[in-house]
Amino acid sequence: MKITYSNQTVDLFDKKHFPTGAPNKVVLSLSGGCDSASLAFLIATYFPQTEIHPFNCKDGDGLIDTERAISVHKYLQGRFSNIKELELFDVRTGDPVWIEKAEKEMADPRNKIMVNGKLTTLWRNVRGCSKALQCRAIRELMAKKYNTVVATGMSCNPPIEVMKERGFYDVAERKRDPGDFESLDVFDYDYGFITYTPYIFTNKKFVSGVYKEHNLIKDLFPLTKSCAWGVESGNENFPNPCGKCFWCNERAWAFQ
């Protein structure tokens, strides 16, 4: 089903990847952010026969994301019967074991890309990589439990010129930069299960369109959180957004 907002189109459960139609069930990573919340809303709205099994990675080093995910889930489940119970999994971004794994992952040449003539890692920092690795393991667990794809709300970065003009290009994850879309696919088979990222070819302007067109700005949107910085990252405004990180800047640009 093709859905268009802010002049960007997402083909949700497209025929190429879902030749028999929308799946009977889907696992969904509900992060507490506005992207995954909007994806859950769209699936629940347009595919009421598809069961949505949400989960959240409960970070012991930053619980506010899970608090937001619980609030988002309560709102969505109150509106849609196909939203099932939220499953929580404990992770810790600062876990020494996972930090060591993250350092090795970031040092691996296969996880580096060329940006402005310099090799850089796919992740912005080691803590971000640590959480990504732990969440990957949980996605695999959920995929096997429900024998279906795991949907995420990951979108691509704003245009390069926008990020540079607004001063947040250097804090963005390079793996999400817009560019050669021919090398991307909404299905990722790399880790023995399928991660489904229908927003991968669109940026957060599409997401803002979902909230605006469905009148979610005053109820669902305030329940979400995008800021990734806690006290450990120097956010003096915590638990309020720092106003400096990539996520704060991206959200401000998309919803202006």
Residue ranges and their predicted role:
Residues M1-Q256:
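Nucleotide-activated chemistry modules centered on ATP-dependent adenylation/adenylyltransferase
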